[in-house]
Amino acid sequence: MQVTETLNEGLKREIKIVVPARNLEEKLNERLDNTKDKIKLNGFRPGKVPAGYLRKMYGKSFMAEILNEIVSDASRSILAERGERSAMQPKIDVEEDKKILDGKADFIFSLKYEVLPKFEIKDFEHIEIIREIAVIPEQEIDDQVKRVLSSACNYSLKDGPSEEGDRVTIDYIGKLEGVPFEGGAESDAQLILGSKQFIPGFEEQLVGVKAGDMKTISVKFPDNYSAVHLAGKNAEFDITVKAVCKSDELKIDDEAAQKVGLESLERLREVVRGQIESQYGSMTRQKIKRQILDALDADYNFEIPEGLLEIEFNNIWAQVNDDLKKAGRSFEDEGVTEEQAREEYRVLAQRRVRLGLVLSEIGMNIGVKVSEDELKAAVFDQVRQYPGQEKEIMDFFRNTPEAVANLRAPIFEEKVIDHLLARIKVTDKEVTVEELMKEYDETDLTEKKPLKKKTAEKVSTKKKAPKKS
């Protein structure tokens, strides 16, 4: 087998392989000889089939198998001999010649691929980050305890107007400039007035309503609302009040805590505090990652494989266009032209690919492994996110190995981030909840905001829960 490098430019490689016809003939004869005792043909005793007849019957199919084996083995062995790692599966181009299957012509094919870039991992000691730790107000814990206990309260219908603390059942349709927007409608929504469950201004306008009332309210979505096509927008909601219920007197004591499954009020407060700390801890973790990745992004500027870049860009671009379509918006609405957006998202794709390679290299150097138990836990975590569809989701992962493999990357990344956190300078800083949440919605592990606004996501008038890290 003759191996010749025909292209070596940047990360691109092309290798030409020539397997002489005589070598193919030798392999075919060996294959025929090894199988002659195993093949049974009518009219011939086992092992007595003439070689010429056997070749006529099976020669081309055996040769096709041999050619496939040569190509498969060559892809692995050539890369190993050259000490290269292919960024993607090499593209194989075969020169067509019918004589090859008869062993009368050389088998010529080429491998085209991009290598993963080689770069040195730099020291991490110079990286400095701020770890913001939210100081949780006791009032927030008090309010959450009340919400938990109110969920166990009994409610009874009332005839009079609603008051703060009452539970109203409503149908609503949200509109922007008179046009209903996606995700802005719900039937039989239950809302406890004063719970701050919905966006500011929504609940307050339902104080004083009675069952059977129809009302249109006006609200303004917060400027930092996560569905950005609604952020800062004025909207109207057509509301039909279906029921108003008054709760029993809310008691905040050990007996009330026991109704929600905890032994005491003190224990309930501990659980609530832990949940809130975990919630804000996820935000802290996300902002830490952003700082680390920004620092790594500044440290590395190597060439990346075009194939990986195109895949990442196409994934981002498809998601962007899908989000815009769902939101009924255009690039012009976002303050950019499509050409500008392409350029900005390509920069984002470059950042993601480069950071992915850096994190992967760090992980390989320190021996990061993802265990099967960790993958199983990740699968179950995904399943829990779809209540009522557990069987379907589990079947999906069971029948789609690549989906399980995709869960490996974030686990791997978390372990690398933990490794870096132990080696960089981290300064803890106590902040208010408001300070922690400032610009939190703009935080993304591997991106800098490419557009003035992000594209849309599923809309709800309810407040958004914090992101998971």
Curated annotation (Swiss-Prot):
Its main location: cytoplasm. GO terms for molecular function: peptidyl-prolyl cis-trans isomerase activity; protein folding chaperone; ribosome binding. One of its GO terms (cellular component) is cytoplasm. It holds the Pfam family FKBP_C. GO terms for biological process: 'de novo' cotranslational protein folding; cell division; chaperone-mediated protein folding; protein transport; protein unfolding. Residues 444-460 have a biased composition (Basic and acidic residues). It catalyses: [protein]-peptidylproline (omega=180) = [protein]-peptidylproline (omega=0). InterPro entries: PPIase_dom_sf, PPIase_FKBP_dom, Trig_fac, Trigger_fac_C, Trigger_fac_C_sf, Trigger_fac_ribosome-bd_bac, Trigger_fac_ribosome-bd_sf, Trigger_fact/SurA_dom_sf. Keywords: Cell cycle, Cell division, Chaperone, Cytoplasm, Isomerase, Rotamase. Disulfide bonds: none annotated. Its EC number is 5.2.1.8. It is found in: Cytoplasm. It is an enzyme of class 5 (isomerase). Residues 165-250 form the PPIase FKBP-type domain. PANTHER family: TRIGGER FACTOR CHAPERONE AND PEPTIDYL-PROLYL CIS/TRANS ISOMERASE (PTHR30560), TRIGGER FACTOR-LIKE PROTEIN TIG, CHLOROPLASTIC (PTHR30560:SF3). Belongs to the FKBP-type PPIase family. Tig subfamily. Involved in protein export. Acts as a chaperone by maintaining the newly synthesized protein in an open conformation. Functions as a peptidyl-prolyl cis-trans isomerase. Consists of 3 domains; the N-terminus binds the ribosome, the middle domain has PPIase activity, while the C-terminus has intrinsic chaperone activity on its own. This is Trigger factor. It comes from Bartonella henselae (strain ATCC 49882 / DSM 28221 / CCUG 30454 / Houston 1) (Rochalimaea henselae). The gene is tig.
